[in-house]
Regions:
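Bacterial signal peptide processing site
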Residues: 41-43
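A non-catalytic alpha/beta surface segment that caps or lines the substrate-entry region
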Residues: 80-133
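Second-shell loop/turn segments in exported
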Residues: 56-62, 77-86, 113-116, 158-170, ...
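N-terminal capping segment at the start of a domain
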Residues: 46, 51-91, 102, 311-327
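Acidic/histidine-rich catalytic neighborhood of metal-dependent amide-processing enzymes
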Residues: 160-259, 288
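Catalytic-core environment of secreted peptidases
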Residues: 65-71, 76-78, 102, 124-185, ...
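C-terminal motif of bacterial Sec signal peptides marking the signal peptidase cleavage site
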Residues: 36-39
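Active-site-adjacent substrate-binding region
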Residues: 120, 233, 242-350
Length: 350
């Protein structure tokens, strides 16, 4: 999924930027998180060329990429996960069952939202918490709904057909379910808490209205599952399963969570995933991390397959009927999942 949201390209409205900056500066938490990251990081790595990054030897991973792949395939087997559909209902029940089985404290946040076209949408955010009593917390996010229309499909006859959303919707959830499995078994957090939030209603937007996207994250960030919720930082996974995916520094991520962004990308390169994680600027995207930054002041980053060098930015199958399992790579899922687990391990050790 992740979003088909309208890609804002790199042009950001100055007023929007100023509003966001004003809100964010009201919070001191991002500064504290920056100090934490600096204290547990080694010497800064200098930026490497793509060739150097590709030659970095890969480190053995505890993250089971095949398991994450199977989690994606299971979601796709439910069919399109459009709010109110049978596939949506069945997938929600399955995700809740998995997360409960993996030892999380699970909360369902059900609500009704009005879409840009006036449609009343029954939505549910799913929150899974590990070590809920810990005061220092990390937020991991993805969206689990799929786009109702394949409106970027090269065949106009398909524009009203729903997509399967293997990558855009399924991939981020697949990685986080595998993270949850590990947190509930071999890698339980000791000193920090981890909250996995799966957002609904991200992909029901209109390209001409950026506020019409990210309905689930907007609702949760205004009505968090815990009163006065805060986290040291947040990591959003969106479209993280494509073959030969390219993850660049997303604009809002770099603006509001530069320490976390550097931490994650440097760790990815250290682990041998520099061919995926490019240490260079990408575009600005309206994605689920933006409402969380705006409404809660939590510094968040977006790991999203968006290549500013390409014409569309997103993968060719984005919002088309081709967003299916044929475009999902276990290797890409493993690169992202291994990186996230390694960052969690470092933060938990300090």
């Amino acid at each position: 999924m992740t979003e088909s949201y309208l890609a804002l390209e790199s042009s950001i409205d100055p007023l929007t930027f100023l509003t966001l900056m004003t809100r964010i500066t009201q919070y001191i938490l991002p500064l504290l998180f920056g100090l934490l990251l600096l204290s547990c990081s080694k010497d800064k790595q200098s930026q490497q060329t793509t060739q150097d990054e590709q030659q970095t030897p890969r480190v053995a991973t505890p993250f089971e990429a095949d398991s994450a792949y199977n989690f994606v395939a299971k979601q796709v087997a439910f069919g399109p996960r459009i709010p109110g559909s049978s596939g949506h209902t069945a997938c929600l029940a399955w995700m809740k069952e998995r997360l409960t089985q993996y030892g999380a404290t699970v909360v369902e946040q059900s609500f009704e939202a009005t879409a840009h076209d006036g449609t009343k949408l029954p939505l549910t955010n799913l929150i899974a918490s590990y070590n809920p009593s810990a005061s220092q917390r990390i937020l991991l996010m993805a969206h689990w709904d799929t786009r109702p229309w394949a409106d970027k499909d090269p065949n106009a006859a398909n524009h009203t057909e729903p997509i399967l959303g293997a990558d855009d919707g399924g991939s981020g959830v697949g990685v986080l379910l595998e993270v949850a499995r590990l947190l509930g078994s071999v890698a339980p957090p000791q000193t920090i808490g981890v909250d996995i939030v799966l957002f609904d209603g991200e992909d029901y937007g209109s390209y001409s209205n950026e506020e019409s996207w990210c309905l689930g994250s907007t609702h949760w960030s205004k009505n968090p599952h815990v009163a006065d919720y805060q986290a040291m930082g947040g990591i959003l996974l969106d479209m993280v399963g494509g073959r030969d995916a390219s993850f660049y520094w997303e604009y809002f991520s770099k603006s509001y969570a530069p320490q976390l962004l550097t931490k994650v990308w440097s760790k990815a390169v250290e682990l041998g995933y520099g061919s995926y994680f490019h240490q260079a600027d990408g575009g600005g995207l309206t994605d689920d991390h933006v409402p969380v930054i705006r409404n809660l002041g939590i510094p968040c980053i977006d790991i999203v397959n968006y290549d500013p060098r390409s014409e569309e930015g997103f993968a060719p199958y984005w919002h088309t009927l081709q967003d299916n399992m044929s475009n999902i790579s276990a290797e890409t899922l493993g690169a992202v999942g291994h990186t996230v687990m390694a960052v969690l391990k470092e933060l938990d050790a300090h």
